[in-house]
Amino acid sequence: MKVGNEFSLTEIVRADSLDDIESARSLFKEYAAWLEIDLCFQDFEKELSELPGEYAPPDGRLLLAFVNKSLAGCIALRKIGEGVCEMKRLFVRPEFRGKRLGRGLAEAIIRNAKQIGYKRMRLDTLPPKMNDAIGLYQSLGFKEIEPYYQNPVPGAIFMELDLGSESPAEARASLKKGPDEPAT
C-alpha cells in the first residue's frame, strides 16, 4: 500500500525477505527499549530469535512502514485462538510520529486479519505510555475487555475488535460514498 504527496511517500509492505525480517527485529528492539519494560513474560528474546515465527503466513502477518524509503514503523498479528488474532508490536519511530503512520499500520493489519478470515482481533496496551495508541484503538472500534492472558505489568488494558463489523472510520467513509460506490 502506498500513500503520499509531493513531499513524502509512505509505503506499508509485508516483511518477506531476510532484510525485512532484520528490519523488523531492529524495530522490535527499539520498541522494547522505548517501553522501558522487561518483556521476558512474553518470551521476547525467543520471539526475536525466531522471527517471523508466529507472525508468518498463513496465520500471521508482519508489516513494515517506510517513509521516503526510510524504515519508519512496524506492526504484526498472530493467531491466538480459533477465529481470534492478536495485534502486536505497533511501533513508529519517534521522528515519524504525528503523521498518521500508526493509523495506517493498524488499518493495514486489520485488513490483513479480515483477509485471513479472523473474526476478532485482540491487543493489550499500557497507559499512560501508550495513551495515543489507546485513542487510536478506540477510534478504530476496539473495546476494552477482561484480560485474556496474565500480564504482570500493572495497569495493562486489554481490547478487542469485532472484525465482522465496520469500524467507526469505515462507517464514516461509507457515508461519504455514493449509494453505488463500495466503501474502501
Protein language model features and the residues they cover:
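Conserved GNAT acetyl-CoA-binding A-motif
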Residues: 113-125
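Residues forming the Rossmann-fold NAD(P)(H) cofactor-binding site
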Residues: 99, 103, 107
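Conserved acetyl-CoA-binding loop of GNAT-fold acetyltransferases
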Residues: 137-146
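Terminal substrate-recognition subdomain of acyl/acetyltransferases
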Residues: 2-6, 155-184
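Conserved G/P- and acidic residue-centered "switch" motifs that form tight phosphate/ATP-binding loops
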Residues: 69, 100, 117
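Acetyl-CoA-dependent GNAT
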Residues: 15-88, 93-94, 106-108, 112, ...
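Conserved beta-strand-loop-alpha-helix junction that forms the acyl-donor binding cleft
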Residues: 123-133, 150-154
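Active-site acidic-Proline motif in GNAT/NAT acetyltransferases
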Residues: 93-99, 128
